Amino acid sequence: MRCPYCGNEDTQVKDSRPTEDNTAIRRRRFCTACGGRFTTFERVQLRELTIIKTNGRRVPFDRDKLMRSVQIAMRKRPVEQERIERMVSGIVRRLESMGESEIPSAMIGKLVMEGLSSLDAVAYVRFASVYRNFREAKDFEEFLGELSGPLGSSLRDEDEDR
């Protein structure tokens, strides 16, 4: 593995263990040239997935991009990183087990919305605002009006706490 600090190809694995949810192997590495230490994660990839964007363009699936978009929605929310990681891993497993190699981006958005709805109500609304392309305050109002059940009451409870 190439060192991210100096580019040297000669690195050593110092520690290797499964992640808590057993979906990856975490490896601590050491560069013999510069002494830098870094962590890598090794995951099973069942198949190469291609995402079909709304404009028809096809791009390779990027798990890190999915994780970044979820983390943006979760920013400053009281949810443990491990729960976020589990949700993203679950989405990736569902995508890989669908049997399709080409997945519409709307399907990923739908799966993220499902996951966030049970994880954090505010993050759910944040993600929805991008996924559904909210343009005005009334878009938020309409969306919040559509919500019913535990998620809607959870959002109303948070609003009353302020």
Swiss-Prot record:
Start and end residues of each ATP-cone domain: 49-139
HAMAP family noted in UniProt: NrdR (MF_00440)
UniProt protein name: Transcriptional repressor NrdR
UniProt superkingdom: Bacteria
Stretch list, region Disordered: 1-21
Annotated gene: nrdR
Pfam families: ATP-cone, Zn_ribbon_NrdR
Basic and acidic residues biased stretches: 11-21
KW Hydrolase (keyword) present: no
